[in-house]
Amino acid sequence: MKVWAYVIAWNEELMLPYYLRHYSTFCDKIIVYDNMSTDSTRMIAESYGDLVEVVPFDSGEEFNDYVHIELKRNSLKNAKGNADFVILCDCDEFVFHKDIRSFLNDNKDCSVFYPAGFQMISDDFPKDLEGQLYDYVQWGEPSPWYTKPMIINLNVIDDVNWVEGAHELDPNLNLGSFWHPVPEDIRPIGEYKEHVWGKWQKMWEILDTFNSKPLKMLHYKYLGADYVSNRYKLYA
């Protein structure tokens, strides 16, 4: 079984070391789409040798969701026949399981995996530390918005189509069996309690169950005021 990870990076010299340290523990290959970074992002990625491939692209110094979605779809095409599972995420998104390779093998009939999302928070960014980021930042809150389609099983499904923002897939897709922290029989499609996006409202009601889910996504965005403000300035 082969697991590949794809990540889009733009001046990620602070976060990328933690990202690579985590995903290199279970991925057979990591592809970094580098958006013409002007810091040490590329050098950090290349320090991992053959495990990491750097693919440059240029969005014209702007955050462009449509470019990112196209990169994701091309990633699936490129990985087909080479990888069994593909993880598609941002640099601050850490798919976590105590034994993820065994988990994927045990659920190899699932087409798409939606890890239970958590918004992780700390007072400051943990700079220049050894070990995993989740060894230092362990507090967060469940987040249905970050319960995203992040792992694709290429042995079951060939292509998927994200909606803008890549937090959800085209609702017209037939995914067959897929893994989601909210049981399918209580995950409504359409309006629910006057909320147009019914399933998001339902997830808010059962957030207390998220911590018991074996597959999680730890989103490390709010790691101190300085780190957050600098990221927003980059995207402005």
Give residue ranges: language-model regions:
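Catalytic-site signature of metal-activated, phosphate-bearing donor transferases
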Residues: 65-76, 96-236
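Acidic donor-binding segment of Leloir-type glycosyltransferases
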Residues: 22-61
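Local beta-strand N-terminus motif with an aromatic residue
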Residues: 2-3, 27, 83, 110
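Generic recognition of short, well-ordered alpha-helical segments
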Residues: 17-18, 43, 98-102
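The conserved acidic donor/metal-binding loop of glycosyltransferases
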Residues: 90-94
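Active-site beta-to-alpha loop of glycosyltransferases that engages the nucleotide-sugar donor
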Residues: 2-21, 36
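Active-site-proximal specificity loops/subdomain of glycosyltransferases
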Residues: 18, 46-89
